[in-house]
């Protein structure tokens, strides 16, 4: 109630239920700075389609500073059509999370891979059969190259 706008998900506006919700948000909102386990997607946009490549990199670096500025680091995702942005997000300069995905949601993990969080989230990468690789500062990454936007583990937002 401090300036965000609910884009979808208002079935129970007065109840204590959490329906899937998509909302615009600002980095300074308390809820954005806290770890939330709910079907809520906060959208913090960045950049401009008309930006030059140099401006685009500066905008992405600013977005990554916001992204990595929170104390949690379990799972993250970027939605982009630009391979350069996806590669930056997955690189050592990009997402500081145990799981980093491109064009797919943040829930779920590749169980065979090392998974877990960074910073104040999770217990490192001690889970999964490849957990030893966590000591190599490696992240589990998923890139969706299709134009469909599937959610992990078959989750569906039926907002119709």
Stretches found by the model and what they are:
Residues 13, 17-160:
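Conserved C-terminal structural/oligomerization subdomain of aldehyde/semialdehyde dehydrogenase
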Residues 1-12, 28:
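Conserved small-domain helix->loop->beta segment predominantly found in fold-type I
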